[in-house]
Structure formats: structure tokens, C-alpha cells
Amino acid sequence: MAEPDYIEDDNPELIRPQKLINPVKTSRNHQDLHRELLMNQKRGLAPQNKPELQKVMEKRRRDQVIKQKEEEAQKKKSDLEIELLKRQQKLEQLELEKQKLQEEQENAPEFVKVKGNLRRTGQEVAQAQES
């Protein structure tokens, strides 16, 4: 390889170029990181660069396994647990029906409420006369 001209000339007025310092090589943190990446690469622990589709498929498989385990756990419920769940559902249904009736009564027009009151008072008067 040809040597540059400024090496042969010993002219003190010339500014001689100096080799640039590589900041990557001088940085201790970067050297440690590079060494760690090389070691992981040799061991096969390199960061996984999986395509997005593969990641989604793995996530779906994990979700599917979790769902299957939950279903198996539900299938293995004892008779007592099943009976308790049935009773709880019945109570919830009764409570919902009760709330619906209350809402219907509250939302009913005024004349329907008055008519119901008149019937009750009429029945009470009839019962009082019979006794």
C-alpha cells in the first residue's frame, strides 16, 4: 500500500493527521454490552426476532390452553358447588324480577295507582262490613 506524501516530508509546518478515537471502543458500557451479546449468541440465548404473526399465534395458543384449563376446572365442580350456583342464580333472577316490578310500579301513570288504591279501600270496606 502506498504511503502518503506527508510521512516522507519532515516539514514541521504541516499538520499531521491523527487517528480518530472510536467512541464505541472506549466506552466501557458498550464493551460490556457487546461482550454479553456475543456470549448470549454463542449459548443460543440471542434475543428472539420472531415475526409478528408467529408471536400472535403463540399468544393464541397460550390463551387457548388457559381457557381449556378453566373449562376443565368448571367440569370438575362438586355437586355441592353446582347446587349452590343454581340457588345463587335463582336468587339473582328473583331479585331482578322484584326490581322490574318496582320499576314498573314507579313508572306507572298516576291514574293506575289511584285505581289500585280505590280497589284496596273498596275491598277493605267490604271485608269490614262482612265481619
Curated annotation (Swiss-Prot):
Annotated positions of the N6-acetyllysine modification: 50
Stretches for region Disordered: 39-78, 100-131
Record keywords: Acetylation, Coiled coil
Pfam family membership, one: DUF1151
Basic and acidic residues compositional bias, start-end: 52-78
Gene Ontology BP term (one): sensory perception of sound
Chain coiled-coil ranges: 61-112
Residue(s) carrying N-acetylalanine: 2
Record family assignment: Belongs to the FAM107 family.
Protein name in UniProt: Protein FAM107B
Source species: Rattus norvegicus (Rat)
